[in-house]
Amino acid sequence: GPSFFAINLALAGHEVTAVDVTGEMLAHAKQNAESYGAKAKFVLHRGEFLPFEDNSFDLIVSRNVVWNLEYPEQALSEWARVLAPGGRMVYFDANWYLYLYDDELRAQKKAAEQAFRAKYPVHNYAGNLPKSRILELEQTAYSLPLSKEKRPEWDRAVLERLGMQIIKVIDDIGPGVQDPLDWERDHPIHTFMICAEKPET
């Protein structure tokens, strides 16, 4: 991503390595880091197949990454591999496209959007995309493996299978971190947080 976490962690005094799969985003991230005087190493690579030795990191942080991966379980396995014993992964994600498979959630999402538009008829928000673009995104998301999974239940099961210890799961962090208007529009789709630790032995 644009290095939000990388910048904040680097400015807090941590040694940071940032990974992204696209060169364009990585260049944007570098530019952002430089503008804040934050020092970090930037690596162009896929999150499912990391070019690092075992036990290399004390902390892995990500936001809105796992949902759009082609091999999400492989990614979590890699993250566990490169974590040092006692290290933790903390990530934020959501069931962004579960509504494509879940009729009840789809109805809730539609109702929330209609209520939002009725309340704020002239509000211009980022989610107001052309119908053709929405359909394009939905077609892409439909084939992704996590679009049909209920999360964070899926994540908890996979992490435990990988031998990770679940430290904390927050099913909906939206009200505390999202812009109030964004949350009002999108609240049927919960943004969650997971923290898991690699055991010492």
Describe the predicted segments one by one.
Residues 145-170:
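Short alpha-helix
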Residues 45-59:
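A short acidic, Gly/Pro-enriched loop at the edge of an enzyme's catalytic core
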Residues 162-165, 179-201:
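Core SAM-dependent methyltransferase catalytic element
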Residues 15, 39, 88, 165-166:
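Residues at the starts of beta-strands that form the adenosine-phosphate
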Residues 88-132:
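Conserved class I S-adenosyl-L-methionine
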Residues 1-49:
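Class I SAM-dependent methyltransferase SAM/SAH-binding core
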Residues 58-72, 95:
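A short SAM/SAH-binding and catalytic strip from SAM-dependent methyltransferases
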